[in-house]
Amino acid sequence: MSWQQPNPARHDVAQRPVARRWSAGACTSVTVLLGALGLTLAVALAYAAEPPYALLGHEAPDFALHAAAGENVRLSEHRGEVVVLSFWSSRCTSCRTQLAALNRSLATYASAGLSVYGVGVDDDPVQAQEFARSAGVGFALLLDPAKTVSRSYQVDNLPMTVLIDRNGTVRYVMRDYSAASSTVYLQQLRTLLNE
């Protein structure tokens, strides 16, 4: 047996596939990381572009509105309950989906001290009532044709849902409606009901 020196060229060739695999893996990891960072940044910018809701953390403006069923409803009479106000219009396409989701919330959490009110901003109360009836709404519908309550709650998009805690403080606002925003809304609602 003779002593052989390792061939440097052969040694490099044997190492190249490992280096290439590592390099390809590193590139893939960096690409995925940059993609996730980009997505996070895009979501953050989208939320940053949304104007802040000035009433968050402040007392909810009191109001009295006429309900479609005939009675008057005053918000301050619901202290001690978690109140959901959903601003909607019969001309809003995503309002129907949101009202159905709120119906499910009421069915699930009514016994925990939850009151849900739909605040219709339609100019025509009859049209608002027909829309709510066709949507199968099971909670009280309040009529705000002059939009005074909508203005006091700074409603700038429909649908818009406002969560008010048992002390009468605005705690969460959901602008528009999507599966993702609905998930966050339900988390916020559960938190308030457990306080």
What are these regions (language model features)?
Residues S76-T93:
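Short active-site neighborhood of thiol/selenol oxidoreductases, capturing the structured segment around
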Residues Y47-L75:
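N-terminal "domain-start" segment that seeds a small globular fold
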Residues R96-A135, P145-S152:
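Structural microenvironment flanking redox-active thiols in thiol-disulfide oxidoreductases
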Residues V84-S86, G118, V162-L163:
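Hydrophobic beta-strand core positions in alpha/beta domains
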Residues A26-A44:
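Bacterial N-terminal signal peptides
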Residues M1-A26:
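N-terminal secretory signal peptides that target proteins for export/translocation
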Residues E130-V137, P145-R190:
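Thiol/disulfide oxidoreductase modules built on the thioredoxin-like
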